[in-house]
């Protein structure tokens, strides 16, 4: 989901990023065109995802490019709410735009004068070898869907509020202990003991 001003200028839509979602949409098109050859029904396709996959399913529910490619959806432990989708160009308070993050990423690897051609020359091994870098406070926000006016005209939250969602059966829910491996403090008994009998209210306020 890397966006960058130079990538946007190369696009006839004047946008960049969301390549992961576009790959998912291309895969759904292939399934719809070919599933009958495997005994499936192209008019009864269900998509399902858990955690990041649940977020992907929820985002596909609002993309106009995925309309008609599936008929039912299941999302577990991943809604994409409230601010997973980043605006492509506009910085909003602490939420840095996708293109700004792309520029920071280029500078991180290649210095102040880095351009998109330099980035294309980077070995893949070098990129994946620094999975612990943080250009912003929240690393998760570096690799998520982008409100670009094309793949995603608006955020997931706004799309559901405005009812700009595919009209089809949609099952949502959460699995027990989802995400606790990423946030061990939440399930550490010492954390509960700090708050005494008020731990439910206090912990809820803390994690929010």
Question: Where in this protein do the model-derived segments appear?
Answer:
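Serine-hydrolase-like catalytic core of hydrolytic proteins
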Residues: 1-113, 150, 159-186
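Substrate-gating cap/lid region and adjacent catalytic-acid/histidine neighborhood
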Residues: 72, 85-87, 118-208
